A protein has these predicted regions:
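SAM-dependent methyltransferase
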Residues: 139, 143-198
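Class I SAM-dependent methyltransferase SAM/SAH-binding core
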Residues: 55-98
Length: 236
């Protein structure tokens, strides 16, 4: 039986590219470039790459990029998008809980909950962070966004479980073929101290957590309870 996040991204690549959160790609890649020191020799891994919006923008700026995603329909769209722009990007169908690149990359990105923190258990989410860590070389860096657990504590979420920090909701959607779906979504929210502990226990030496603004990622943005997402930069 498919999980809700598999159903969410199945046959929905066209709709995905029209979502509001995809409008911030340019500004977000500007931040990645700054974090990469504008070094075009770096190898970058895009985990949960979807239709390739970040990977393609990075490749267009001269970076070597690999994208992985669980959804073949999303990857098919990503490959078409890259081909239309004559860009050489490797896209692979891989589960973020089970991949191994063993120190091949200088930078890994994981944006807009493309993988973490959508999994059924905390252990699965942890495995994603472990795999991201293992994919990086000794001076590697991981940049990702995740759901801010402070937000539902200060806002009214009738569906939020304060014991598990999971928000369980029903979501109605229409796929690219016009088929309607009703999904039972289950997303894990994290507070900053959890993220810091998880990443430190894996082996990251420095963890920076900031507020997250669509298309305007910045280390100068302080995280507050008004931020729906947090931006995390973890360095080996």
């Amino acid at each position: 039986m498919k999980q809700w996040y598999e159903e969410l991204f199945e046959n929905s690549a066209d709709n995905y590219e029209n979502e509001e959160f995809t409008k911030g790609t340019i500004g977000e890649v500007d931040f990645f470039e700054k974090e990469a020191g504008y070094d075009k020799s770096l190898k970058i891994l895009d985990i949960g790459c979807g239709t390739g919006r970040h990977a393609i923008e990075l490749a267009s700026r001269g970076y070597r990029v690999t994208g992985i995603d669980l959804s073949e329909s999303q990857l098919e769209k990503a490959r078409k998008n890259a081909t239309s722009r004559n860009l050489d990007i490797s896209f692979f169908r891989k589960d973020a809980r089970d991949f191994n690149f063993n120190g091949e990359f200088d930078l890994a990105i994981m944006i807009c909950e493309g993988a973490f923190p959508l999994m059924e258990t905390d252990e699965m989410n942890f495995h994603i962070l472990q795999n991201a860590f293992n994919s990086l070389n000794d001076r590697g860096k991981l940049i990702f966004t995740t759901l801010n657990g402070l937000f539902p504590l200060f806002h009214s979420f009738a569906t939020f479980d304060h014991l598990t920090f999971r928000n369980i909701t029903t979501y109605e959607m229409t796929d690219d073929s016009g088929n309607k779906k009703v999904l039972n979504c289950n997303e894990r929210y994290y507070v900053p101290s959890e993220i810091t502990w998880l990443l430190s226990s894996i082996g990251f030496k420095k963890v920076t957590i900031c507020g997250c603004q669509l298309g305007a990622f910045s280390r100068d943005e302080a995280l507050t309870s008004e931020n729906f997402e947090m931006l995390v930069v973890a360095e080996k």
